[in-house]
């Protein structure tokens, strides 16, 4: 979840050489997981079979929410999505989001965000180039915080796109391979979703996941 406020839910200047673009291996959408943490803080609707979801939230959001669609078991395969996302003045992310079981880790590939860049307050790991843009990469450690196994200590990994966008293909493997140089397990995946998260301000998102 967010780096600076109280963690909630189950659910970062060295430079790295660009990662060569691999051949994209797309998954069939095959969506089988709905992420709905505190979706009641806004208007969350979804169509799992169509791979679409929407979230609208207003000023006065009292806590953190994470909503989206994806898969019960994550992977390094590419994800293609399109979205309409408006979060100006809101602390919010549009991101590929998920967890690794061991070593336990929470991760984000942030495609667009509102008024808060998580790498502004975390430990920099450098940059990685993927899908037409440089991504800032950073990490943080969460100590005795809620997680997929209850209360635990785990690592967060973030890749934050500099040239933000709201549609495209995310070559997940590029990020996983870079993070793996810094302790990311790159296996034993828990769920993985295309998600919207926010914890302040107002905004809206409509997202379609095609692969």
Swiss-Prot record:
InterPro entries: ConA-like_dom_sf, GH11/12, GH11_AS_1, GH11_AS_2, GH11_dom, Glyco_hydro_11. It is found in: Secreted. Gene3D superfamilies: 2.60.120.180. Keywords: Carbohydrate metabolism, Disulfide bond, Glycosidase, Hydrolase, Polysaccharide degradation, Secreted, Signal, Xylan degradation. The active site is at residues 106, 197. GO terms for biological process: xylan catabolic process. Transmembrane segments: none annotated. Pathway: Glycan degradation; xylan degradation. GO terms for molecular function: endo-1,4-beta-xylanase activity. This is Endo-1,4-beta-xylanase A. The gene is xynA.
């Amino acid at each position: 979840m967010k780096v600076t406020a109280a963690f909630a839910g189950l659910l970062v200047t060295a430079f790295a050489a660009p990662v060569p673009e691999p051949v994209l291996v797309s998954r069939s959408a095959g969506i089988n997981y709905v992420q709905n943490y505190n979706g009641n803080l806004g208007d969350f609707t979804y169509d799992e079979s169509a791979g679409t979801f929407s979230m609208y939230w207003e000023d006065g959001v009292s806590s953190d929410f994470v909503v989206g669609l994806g898969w019960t078991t994550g992977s390094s395969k590419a994800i293609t999505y399109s979205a309409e996302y408006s979060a100006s003045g809101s602390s919010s992310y549009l991101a590929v989001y998920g967890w690794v079981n061991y070593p336990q880790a929470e991760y984000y590939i942030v495609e667009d965000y509102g008024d808060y860049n998580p790498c502004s307050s975390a430990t920099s790991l450098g940059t990685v180039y993927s899908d037409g843009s440089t991504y800032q990469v950073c990490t943080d450690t969460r100590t005795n915080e809620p997680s997929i196994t209850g209360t635990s200590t785990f690592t967060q990994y973030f890749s934050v796109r500099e040239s933000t966008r709201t549609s495209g293909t995310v070559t997940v493997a590029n990020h996983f391979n870079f993070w793996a140089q810094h302790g990311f397990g790159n296996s034993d995946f828990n769920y993985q979703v295309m998600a919207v998260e926010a914890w302040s301000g107002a905004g809206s998102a409509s997202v379609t996941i095609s692969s």
